[in-house]
Amino acid sequence: MSYIKKLRARLDSGEISAVELTKEYLAKIKEQDKRINSVITLCEAEALKEAEDADAIISAGKQGLLTGIPILHKDLFCTKGIRTTAASKMLDNFVAPYDSTVTKNCKDQGMVTLGKLNMDEFAMGSTNEYSYYGAVSNPWDLERVPGGSSGGSAAAVAAGFAPISTGSDTGGSVRQPASFCGLTAMKPSYGSTSRFGMVAFASSFDQAGIFGHYAEDVALMLDAIAGECEFDSTCVGVKQNHFTQDLEKDISGKVIGVDESLIKDLPAQIQEAVSKTLDNFKKLGAEIKSVKVPDLKEALSTYYIITPAEAAANLARYDGIRYGYRNPEARDLDELYRKSRTDGFGAEVKRRIMIGNYVLASSQYDSYYNKSQQLRKVMTDQINQIFTQVDAIFMPASPSEAFKKGDKLDPVSAYLSDIYTIPANISGLPAIAFPIGFANNLPVGGQLMAKAFNDNILTQMVVQYQKHYGIEEFILQQARI
């Protein structure tokens, strides 16, 4: 099941041209995004030019799988000649002089960039309420959040503004929004995709990810954007068909680990969806094995010490001098720094910078940052030990369905919504979220996590799951939004 392959067939048969397809999506964005606020920058002229180029390639019979396929990018991937804001006043007028590796790889495949997507400022948030350009609405219920930080990426695909979108995942920022919006999304193994040209939040956690309706589309796109990059020393590269190599194989004999203690306190409807999902995996031949994962609250605390520290270092570059917002009223250098950063950053970003600088202070370093790094290593070892017994670990993607805007403005309450997704980021492991049911008529997602660079096991398992148990109910309901 693949939207990309369906669109490929329509384009290759001449049923529709790339320009016509692009115009359809652009028109839908212009007509409907006023309610959702998922797009920061619409790239109409650029998209139509790229679509014309794609049509010429198709006419010459030289097209690839992705030639002419429209895509939307989270607005932290640099796009040459198009502004890249990271949803911050600090970068409101920043036009990137180069393409990120992710966007370049998409362009090289002949894809059509429709626009840049809203997000939590500098990817710091779980609700997409922390954006200089306003909150994003969940297409399933406009009063609710789409999740974050890649809320615009999830909302746009759920609303039908593009068949696919890019996102980034530092602590669950593709998987939690996918759960809230009824989509499939994947954070690949750390190092499988390049971070070059991706606005940094926490460099040892950040990883590009993909949103789509179907796991097959997510796998196809990850194959397209993954690979070695000379500009990112952490990018180890993966073989060409790393994510798609086993999609057609059944999953009989695969072992899925489940920690029951993570499920027993969930709302009843989510517990029911989880139970049904595990039963379906058993029907496909998988074995369910009881395991014990590391304490998730400890993982959450570790994450919210290390990532602010990395953020404080990464965001030190925004000083009002080299690029970004500059306060026009500053009278001296100190005032320029202070006013530019005070005005240019939003409240959540400033909160995390302050936390980061505090834990990095010489008086606190050993008590907080150093101990958190030690705990990160211990947790990674514990999780990897589980994979000596199982092929994948299953857990919910979020402890709840999408909540209403304003319900979790308390930072700690919002941070807890990442509790199931953070372990994969702490340990650099691949994880995929996919729809498993409904709670209060809103979608909820499950999550599978695998050993590092066993990404193909995850895509295989979810492709086979969706092949036999489908997600058409999610697609049909979204079509009526």
Swiss-Prot record:
Source species: Francisella tularensis subsp. mediasiatica (strain FSC147)
InterPro entries listed in its UniProt record: Amidase (IPR000120), Amidase_CS (IPR020556), Amidase_dom (IPR023631), AS_sf (IPR036928), GatA (IPR004412)
GO BP field: translation
Highest taxon of source: Bacteria
Reaction(s) this enzyme catalyzes, per UniProt: L-glutamyl-tRNA(Gln) + L-glutamine + ATP + H2O = L-glutaminyl-tRNA(Gln) + L-glutamate + ADP + phosphate + H(+)
Lineage of origin: Bacteria, Pseudomonadati, Pseudomonadota, Gammaproteobacteria, Thiotrichales
Cytoplasm listed as a keyword: no
Listed Pfam families: Amidase
Enzyme Commission (EC) number: 6.3.5.7
Disulfide pattern: none
Enzyme superclass (EC): ligase
Any one cellular-component term (Gene Ontology): glutamyl-tRNA(Gln) amidotransferase complex
Keyword Protein biosynthesis: yes
The name this protein goes by in its record: Glutamyl-tRNA(Gln) amidotransferase subunit A
Active site annotation, chain numbering: K74 (charge relay system), S149 (charge relay system), S173 (acyl-ester intermediate)
Family stated for the protein in its record: Belongs to the amidase family. GatA subfamily.
Biological role: Allows the formation of correctly charged Gln-tRNA(Gln) through the transamidation of misacylated Glu-tRNA(Gln) in organisms which lack glutaminyl-tRNA synthetase. The reaction takes place in the presence of glutamine and ATP through an activated gamma-phospho-Glu-tRNA(Gln).
Keywords: ATP-binding, Ligase, Nucleotide-binding, Protein biosynthesis
Subunit field text: Heterotrimer of A, B and C subunits.
HAMAP family: GatA
Coiled-coil portions: none
